[in-house]
């Protein structure tokens, strides 16, 4: 976990462990197979390909027309067709419009948080579709979140975080890129700028305010129990940026936990 540089032997072991995990999870749920939201990005492509190796997988491609880049739709469909993964493409515009209308009926303005509120609605709409397919066809929902995103809370609670299992949730983003190359995924998937596609022109690194390479280095050191001062000194990264990452990790812990239960019995 503490090394960001993996050998081919490491990657082979990781692939086996993840595919075994997927297989066992499907069997434990007495499910027919799995479903995964395929965005055209590296995380979902890696998960889809690993799952397809060992299970009956259906991919859902869920663009918002006018927001999701056509390139992403093309990449997602190309990955599915190239590797023979059955898929369904569903435009989510009407669903989002309905949910936004409901928000209006509740007389909620959103204020300065409007962009984030709408983005969360989109992520939760996709979650609803994932589970509609999963429930109808007796599948489990595969999440595509990686360790980097999970640690800093870069996902929507009960949105893209609403899944049954997280096959790559133990891998930092840096690891995911290495695994993608090991699996021989196309360069156009590996080299594209990561984006959640929640608004026009959105990119992960711009929203996070830090490059994934630096973010992963900080997270690895935090996982080792290093202090902010030690990390700042050893990595040569601005202290304010290290503190920002540290605070995000603390503030997003609730996203990784089940809701607290009030204890009423002695």
Describe every region a protein language model picked out.
Residues 56, 104-105, 160, 185, ...:
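Residue-level marker of structural boundaries
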Residues 58-60, 164, 242:
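Short hydrophobic/aromatic-enriched beta-strand-loop microsegments
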């Amino acid at each position: 976990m503490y090394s960001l540089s993996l050998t081919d032997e490491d990657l082979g072991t990781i692939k086996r462990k993840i595919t075994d995990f997927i297989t066992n999870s499907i069997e434990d749920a007495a499910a027919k197979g799995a479903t995964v939201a395929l965005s055209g990005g590296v995380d979902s492509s890696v998960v889809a390909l690993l799952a397809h190796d060992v299970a009956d997988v259906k991919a859902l491609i869920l663009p918002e027309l006018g927001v999701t880049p056509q390139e992403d739709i093309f990449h997602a469909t190309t990955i599915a067709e190239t590797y023979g993964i059955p898929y369904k493409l569903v435009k989510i515009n009407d669903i989002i419009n309905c949910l936004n209308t409901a928000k209006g009926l509740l007389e909620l303005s959103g204020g300065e948080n409007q962009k984030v509120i709408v983005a969360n609605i989109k992520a939760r709409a996709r979650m609803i579709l994932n589970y509609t397919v999963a429930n109808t066809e007796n599948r489990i929902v595969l999440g595509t979140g990686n360790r980097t995103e999970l640690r800093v809370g870069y996902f929507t609670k009960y949105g893209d975080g609403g899944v049954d299992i997280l096959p790559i949730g133990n891998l930092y983003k840096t690891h995911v890129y290495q695994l993608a190359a090991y699996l021989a995924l196309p360069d156009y998937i590996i080299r594209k700028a990561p984006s959640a596609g929640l608004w026009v022109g959105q990119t992960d690194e711009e929203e996070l305010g830090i490059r994934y390479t630096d973010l992963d280095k900080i997270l690895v050191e935090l996982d080792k129990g290093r202090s902010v001062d030690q990390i700042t000194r050893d990595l040569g990264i601005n202290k304010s940026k290290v503190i920002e990452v540290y605070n995000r990790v603390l503030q997003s812990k609730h996203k990784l936990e089940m809701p607290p239960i009030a204890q009423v019995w002695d």
